[in-house]
Structures are given as structure tokens and as C-alpha cells.
Amino acid sequence: ADGDKDVLYQYMSKVDLYVFDESGHILGVGSYNQDELTKFEAVPSFKLQPGRRYKVVAVGNAYDHTEVVNYATETDFANIYLQNPAWSDPDVPVTNHDYNYLGQKEFVMPNQEGVMYRDTVTLYSSHIKVDVEIHGLPAPDASRQDAEIPYQLSFENSNAQTSFENEVNLSEKGTIYPDLIYDSENQCYRTQDLALFRMDDTTGELNADYCEHILVLKNKNTGQELIRGNLYNYLLRNADAIDVTKQEAELPIAIEFNGVNAEIKLPDWVIVDGKPEWN
């Protein structure tokens, strides 16, 4: 996170450690859960030779929405990627990403016998937390217990892969279809725990090539497109309130329908206190 405080276990409940030799060939993968991280009991189980150089990559929060591809065949970290497993299956929609983090370190094992080597891998966010809320549309049919959400949200041209260098792969983009829930207390549809890969370039600046996302909302029953908006333009308009280049960046979006008019705007809670009502 921004700052010097050690907050590893607050943001990550699982870390996978990929160990490579100095040429970039994979030697093994170790996984460590939140309990091990919290109590500092994670003990790597790799047999490393004294005097040799190694590279490690730490991946945080790789759960159901994360797979690592090419690590067994590629030696260039720029060609090893995190992605949602469904990206490789055209019949399965991608609905989310995990709250991933990435970090890497290169080190040389000491030659001295019986010497313990200790080092630190700093992890950086690979994701942006996204909150989308939709106001002014009819609620689901309350008379039916099995009533489905009648609207489909999507982000076209979404970044599909992030490399072990923690850089977005600009040549791989696709459409993500986040699940919507209906919030009866706040009378709106909204996303829940949605994450997208980052939208800033290698210098940490918002870049149109990294943010080609198009937000689309459709009526599932009729196929009618209700609204379409360019995410990059939205971020430029609201640069004083939203900064997606930060660590732990958040992207709040409100879609508001008023009669025949629809608008993509900042949620009211961003202006008031910066926290959504459901958090």
C-alpha cells in the first residue's frame, strides 16, 4: 500500500511464490495462506544451491479468477501472465478478476555454510477495485423467487492479461461481464467485489492505450443497449475525484436513469464522504 507500513496480511490472504533460476527457468511454486502470513510461519520448501543467483515472483490473491500462463515455458517475465481462466474459453464469460498483487526479487544464495538468507519482496497492486451502481431502473420481479437480474453490464476492450513485470499486455483485450446484484436497501443495481486490471502505463500515468474500456449496459430480455460510455473520458472528466494510478486504487461509477435520459456520473457518496453506503 502507499506508505511504509507492513500491511501484507490485511490485503492478501494467499501468496504464491514462483522461484526461477538465473536464466528464468521455473524451479518450483510454493503457496502460503493467510494464517502463515499473519504469524510469519511461511517456510519455503526450495532446495537452492549456495553461490547461485535466483529470481522469485510473488503473486497475491490468486484464486478462482486467476491463472498464471506460460511460466513453465517462458524465461522472460514479460511473457508470463496473470489472466482469468475463462479468457482461453470462448464459451465461458469472464465475470471478474481477483484482487491480485505482484512483486519480484533477484538474489544470490550465500556461499557460507549454515548462513540463513533473508530478503523482502515488495508486492504492488495489479488491480483496480471497481464499484458500479445503477439507479432509476425497475427492480427485479419481487413476485418471483427465481427472478433474474434483467440487465447485463459489460466492459468491452478490458485488459485481459498482466505480466510478471506487473505490466498490462496491450495486445490482449476482451469483454468482461460483471455480475450485478439488486440492493433493495439503496434501491439500485450494483457490482460486488469487482476488480479490473490496472489502467496506468509503465510510468504510472493514465494512458488511453491502457484504458480503452467501453462500459455498456443492456436489457437482457430485449437485447436493447441502454447506455454506452468511454471509461477513459470518464476518468479525465473526474480526475479531481478519481486517481486510478494509486496503489489500492478505486474506480466508482454511477449510471443514472431519469425517464428517457441516462448519464454516467460520479456516485453521490464520492462527493460526500468517499465511501459507498454498502461498505
Spell out what each predicted region is.
Residues 2, 22, 51-53, 61-63, ...:
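Generic structural motif
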Residues 1-10, 134-142:
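Short amphipathic, basic-aromatic surface patches that mediate peripheral association
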Residues 80-125, 135, 229-279:
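Extracellular beta-sheet/turn segments enriched in Thr/Pro/Gly and aliphatic residues
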Residues 5, 16, 25-126:
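Short, low-hydrophobicity acidic/polar segments
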Residues 56-62, 128-146, 243-255:
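Repeat-unit-sized solenoid/scaffold elements
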Residues 87-188:
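A sequence/structural signal for flexible, mid-protein segments enriched
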Residues 11-71, 142-240, 278-279:
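Tryptophan-paired
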